[in-house]
Swiss-Prot record:
<keyword id="KW-0874">Quinone</keyword>
<keyword id="KW-0520">NAD</keyword>
<keyword id="KW-0472">Membrane</keyword>
<comment type="similarity">
    <text>Belongs to the complex I subunit 1 family.</text>
</comment>
<feature type="transmembrane region" description="Helical">
    <location>
        <begin position="154"/>
        <end position="174"/>
    </location>
</feature>
<dbReference type="GO" id="GO:0003954">
    <property type="term" value="F:NADH dehydrogenase activity"/>
</dbReference>
<dbReference type="GO" id="GO:0005886">
    <property type="term" value="C:plasma membrane"/>
</dbReference>
<keyword id="KW-1003">Cell membrane</keyword>
<keyword id="KW-0997">Cell inner membrane</keyword>
<dbReference type="GO" id="GO:0009060">
    <property type="term" value="P:aerobic respiration"/>
</dbReference>
<protein>
    <recommendedName>
        <fullName>NADH-quinone oxidoreductase subunit H</fullName>
        <ecNumber>7.1.1.-</ecNumber>
    </recommendedName>
</protein>
<keyword id="KW-1133">Transmembrane helix</keyword>
<feature type="transmembrane region" description="Helical">
    <location>
        <begin position="269"/>
        <end position="291"/>
    </location>
</feature>
<feature type="transmembrane region" description="Helical">
    <location>
        <begin position="75"/>
        <end position="95"/>
    </location>
</feature>
<dbReference type="Pfam" id="PF00146">
    <property type="entry name" value="NADHdh"/>
</dbReference>
<feature type="transmembrane region" description="Helical">
    <location>
        <begin position="42"/>
        <end position="62"/>
    </location>
</feature>
<keyword id="KW-1278">Translocase</keyword>
């Protein structure tokens, strides 16, 4: 087995382990953030400051009975959470997480694969995760799960169109789909960040990412007040945990991509080294998603579709046209 294959396998194992741990810890942080906004304490009993709540929840999920409802399609019911996990982690393959560094005289590139269509790969593989809620709802033999899967089809496919069109304008400026090249394009300094050249694209992509991540206010797939837990209604134990671990892993992936594409990535930020700079940016966008969840109300399906097709899609197309005109001029 070649050194390249061994290195890649080690990177994959580290990526899965790190983001699985981060996903679990993010649940604790989110509960604390929501508690602060709602003037509650949040997790505070298990361990100091409730830090061991994540471990307690993990033990609970691993030891709960795995129930498959009567009349459900067992194969598809089991495959759905696996698809969610696989799509979330595979989509991270073209993301350069940190600058290259040297370890024991060997240069380490913190990226699985620097493919020249990295941004497109990220969106395409992430979009494949749409099948997870759809199949989960169809296989559960539950009306609430079925409604959740129908909403997943409408919501995720609609916003996938918007997010794909939105990235075209920044890519026209950079001239590459590689996330490494996009990062290098902004290496000149603070004013080279694409958020200043493409502010509309950033806003549209941020909103579309919340919709694709099924984050509030776009949590139509599993809104408790309407459809219990949506496509997850019949899931329990480890399978239920896999869905939410995939959601948080995807949240971190989108935060990295937004930081790389619009905010200079892992380039040095003044006196702040690149590795620390991207951690600050990613942490901000993860916190922002939690802040939005605590602040904005849930939207209705018709409001969501109107915003997507009548507002965001025309704005994305207009931004492409304006960017093309400016480049030609």
């Amino acid at each position: 087995m070649s050194a390249y294959i061994i290195e890649t396998l080690i990177k994959i194992l580290i990526l899965v382990a790190v983001f699985s741990a981060l996903g679990g810890f993010a649940t604790y942080i989110e509960r604390k953030v929501l508690a602060y906004f709602q003037r509650r304490l949040g997790p505070s009993y298990v361990g100091p400051f409730g830090l061991l709540q994540v471990a307690a929840d993990g033990i609970k999920l691993f030891t709960k009975e795995d129930i498959i409802p009567q009349g459900a399609n067992k194969l598809i019911f089991t495959l759905a959470p696996i698809i969610a996990m696989v799509s979330a982690f595979v989509s991270m393959a073209p993301i350069p997480f940190f600058p290259n560094f040297t370890l024991f005289g060997y240069e380490i590139k913190p990226i699985i694969s620097d493919i020249n269509i990295g941004f497109l790969f990220f969106l395409a593989v992430g979009a494949a995760g749409i099948y997870a809620p759809i199949l989960a709802g169809l296989a559960s033999n539950n009306k609430y799960s079925l409604i959740g899967s129908a909403r997943a089809t409408i919501q995720l496919l609609s916003f996938e169109v918007v997010s794909t069109l939105t990235i075209l304008a920044p890519l026209m400026v950079v001239g590459s789909l590689s996330l490494v090249e996009i990062n290098n394009y902004q290496s000149g300094g603070f004013l080279d960040w694409l958020v200043f050249k493409q502010p509309l694209a950033f806003i549209l992509f941020l909103i579309a990412s919340y919709a694709e991540l099924n984050r509030t206010p776009f949590d139509l797939l599993e809104h408790e007040a309407e459809i219990v837990a949506g496509y997850c209604t019949e899931y329990s134990g480890l399978k239920w945990g896999m869905f939410f671990l995939a959601e948080y892993a995807h949240l971190f992936a989108f935060s990295f991509v937004i930081s790389i594409v619009f905010f200079g990535g892992f380039n040095a930020w003044g006196f702040i080294p690149g590795g620390i700079a991207i951690l600050i940016k990613v942490s901000f966008f993860v916190f922002l998603s939690m802040w939005v969840r605590a602040t904005y109300p849930h939207v209705r399906p018709d409001q969501l579709m109107n915003m997507c097709w009548k507002i965001m899609l025309p704005l994305a197309l207009l931004n492409i046209v304006l960017t093309g005109v400016i480049i030609l001029i």
